[in-house]
């Protein structure tokens, strides 16, 4: 087994090394960089890239990467490490926080207020965010055979753990199935997003959405850990029996339910609930608590995203619903893989993607 070379550093088989992607100096002359941890196995195998924190306020993915590097005790090179480097086949490139400065500012975007996940593959001589995107794309994506991008819902929303992938790319769909969430949503991603540009360049990429921003939610974190390990087992990188959900629903479209009036919101549903078209999913009150409006589901399907903010204005997104008939929902409970046909999920002109 040969050593793995990353940014001029030689990494011997069976070792883990802390590295970085350099970004140039900050305002005070301080060096700026993206932290990277490379686990290089003792056996040959694929290179899997694991990326989190492209949006600085989305922290669940950061914790997923931490646990995969160091185990539950967060101490390197101990017996409880999640991944045994001596038994690892291939290489895992871990990037726990891409947008370091955004994280320190507790905001989604970079310090220049641009969304890094609309700027891939980036530009070496571009603005701050383009340079971050370029460093990640050239340093990690170009080295990876496969990629997993970890996200949470934006501020004041939450997402049921689910994977988004381009169903029209066979390897992406296979990775999504292997990850093992109950819901898999077809989405190639917006132009400039990491998963779209990486997949286009030949690195099959999937995205996990789990939980909300600004916190570590251990249920969401554990779903991410299990999913990454499932993918590694699928790729032959580790020996492990995959832990799959009781059902898996493959859906091609989703639709937002939006508030038609402002006020104080009371949700009547939670992520994972199956709702029927016309079902009451939330109500809006005036400042004294009197009901003024009811929000109904625009389609039949499963709630995968929900606002957490009780203060709403007309047009605000309330619930993201993946489109699925009641028959398909019942079928999914007894069949391992159920795919909702395209004809059940047409007419949605809105983008699913916050990531």
What are these regions (language model features)?
Residues 1-355:
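Structured catalytic-domain cores with a bias toward divalent-metal coordination
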């Amino acid at each position: 087994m040969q050593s793995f070379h990353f940014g001029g550093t030689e990494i011997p088989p069976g070792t883990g090394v802390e590295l970085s992607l350099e970004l140039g100096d900050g305002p005070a002359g301080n060096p700026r960089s993206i932290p990277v941890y490379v686990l290089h196995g003792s056996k040959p195998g694929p290179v899997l890239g694991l990326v989190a924190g492209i949006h600085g306020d989305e922290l669940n993915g950061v914790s997923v990467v931490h646990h995969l590097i160091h185990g539950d005790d967060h101490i390197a090179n101990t017996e409880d490490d999640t991944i045994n480097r001596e038994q690892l086949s291939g290489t895992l490139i871990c990037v726990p926080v891409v947008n370091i400065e955004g994280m320190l500012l507790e905001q989604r975007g970079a310090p220049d207020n641009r969304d890094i996940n609309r700027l891939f593959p980036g530009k070496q001589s571009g603005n701050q965010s383009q340079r971050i995107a370029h460093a990640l794309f050239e340093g990690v994506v170009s080295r990876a055979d496969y990629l997993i991008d970890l996200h949470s819902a934006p501020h004041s929303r939450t997402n049921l753990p689910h994977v988004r992938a381009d169903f029209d790319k066979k390897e992406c769909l296979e990775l999504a199935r292997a990850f093992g969430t109950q819901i898999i949503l077809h989405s190639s991603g917006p132009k400039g997003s990491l998963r779209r540009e990486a997949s286009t360049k030949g690195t099959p990429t999937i995205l996990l959405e789990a939980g909300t921003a600004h916190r570590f939610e251990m249920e969401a974190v554990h779903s991410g850990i299990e999913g990454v390990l499932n993918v590694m087992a699928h790729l032959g990188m580790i020996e492990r029996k995959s832990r799959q959900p009781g059902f898996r629903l493959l859906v091609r479209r989703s639709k937002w339910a939006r508030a038609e009036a402002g006020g104080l919101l009371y949700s009547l549903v939670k992520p994972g609930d199956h709702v029927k078209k016309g079902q009451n999913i939330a109500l809006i009150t005036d400042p004294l608590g009197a009901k003024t409006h009811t929000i109904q589901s625009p389609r039949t399907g499963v709630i995968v995203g929900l606002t957490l903010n009780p203060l709403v204005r007309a047009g605000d997104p309330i619930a993201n619903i993946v489109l699925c008939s009641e028959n398909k929902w019942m079928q999914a409970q007894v069949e391992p893989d159920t795919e909702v046909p395209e004809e059940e999920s047409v007419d949605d002109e809105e983008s699913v993607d916050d990531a």
